[in-house]
Amino acid sequence: MANIITRRSILGAGVGMAALAAGGETLAQSQVRGDASVAAPRLPIENGATLRILRPVRFVQPDEEVFRASAARFSQQTGVQVRVDFVGWEDINQQTAVTANTGAGPDCIIGFGDSPHIYADKLVEVSDIAEYLGKKYGGWMFVGEKLGKRHGTNNWIGLPFGGTAGPLVWRKSAVKEVGYDAPPSDLPGFLEMCKRLRRANKPSGFALGNAVGDGNGFANWLMWSHGASITNESGAVSVNSPQTLAALNYQKELYPTFVDGGTISWGDISNNQAYAANTCWVTSNGVSLYFALKNDPATRAIAEDTEHSVMPLGVANSWPSAPLTLNAMVFKHSRFPNAAKAFLTYMMEQEQYEPWLNANLGYWAHPLNAYRASAVWTSDPKITLFRDSMNNQFWNGYKGPISEASGQANAEYVLVQMFASVAAGQATPDAAMREAERRARRIFRRG
């Protein structure tokens, strides 16, 4: 869907402007404090500048309304015509690739995490605006800096906009029924809880299908909580390790405790459906599942019985989860790079960003420290945990550099299929690990 914004169309923004106005009222009581003494970079907007912006579709309606309204206000203040296209999540990577490889299309894409690293040579450096925003708003959180900077440099090639993590989602009543106040934070204890839930006919379930978010997220958690990784710090393939073998053996014990029929065919919405249907009582998911349950009278009772907590750490020092991150890029083919950078800066200033963050109900978490004080994080105690999603110390391709190869390994579900083959009884843990190593070596040699 597209939206052309001009000076004349400002008044047609409708509900979006109303949403932004409501956000402005919230700002009057905001606890977010930016440093007004930090000087903004000088970005003289090019004569006759127009912009086309591409980003993923909304999670909740106010996301789009507030985003469009803020873009409209940018047009009003600068005279720059802005077109905003919202495209499906499954299409954003493909459209990013086409734009980068053809040198034509949107001036700016707010894509997903590793895209700027894949197409770094096609992008305008954005260090000036990233450093300004960091200084003004308390510094960048770990994932924001990790995904924003080109590996091994201080040069910013992306501008992280927000991220969403997938913690443990669980039913209080079921967990209490099997003897716990909350899921154990250690791996043996968590396995024992899942066994008890299975015996109580209230099983857990985690995706082992080719699911972009949930499948990769679960496989990564299994790896990282055991100290395993697909590559080491230098980027060499490291999947063949005692730690990976331990993760596979753990999953071999865990999988029989899952829902009837198993989860090898689960996609990204399968666990949502099973949880809402009372066939799965513990899973992992973003905040979307909770709000979908809360907003439907038929499932509101499930939402009231739902809690979130960090997945068991195992040997990790922090939550072993890599947030799915929105990461903005400005392309070299744009005739108006200053206008594009000015737009992104404007959208991340408090007057625009905080209402947008609050409107997303916790689905997207901020990458700048000052926004920890935003009202959304205390609006419902069940979502406060998501506030620090962008400070998780993990990323896709951990422990190595973010690269085209690390993105490809994720896209080809190398780790997911390794665990799934053991769960299905198609391979022993050792054989599955060696096959994953073979695939990873092919990908990282090519990358």
What are the functions of these language-model segments?
Residues 194-196, 234-265, 311:
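Glycine-centered hinge/linker elements that transmit conformational signals in sensory
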Residues 69-141, 173-185, 272-274, 278-282, ...:
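Extracytoplasmic "Venus flytrap"/periplasmic binding protein-like
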Residues 98, 106-107, 133-174, 317-321, ...:
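A structural signal for short loop-to-beta-strand junctions that line the ligand-binding cleft
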Residues 1-18:
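N-terminal secretory signal peptides and thylakoid transit peptides that target proteins
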Residues 30-45, 112-167, 191, 303-309:
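Hinge/lid segment of periplasmic solute-binding proteins
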Residues 148-161, 166, 191-237, 280:
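Extracytoplasmic/periplasmic solute-binding protein
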Residues 37, 43-46, 81-82, 176, ...:
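Conserved C-terminal helix/tail region of periplasmic/extracytoplasmic solute-binding proteins
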Residues 36-39, 140, 306-310, 358-414, ...:
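Long, aromatic- and glycine/proline-rich binding clefts that accommodate carbohydrate-like moieties
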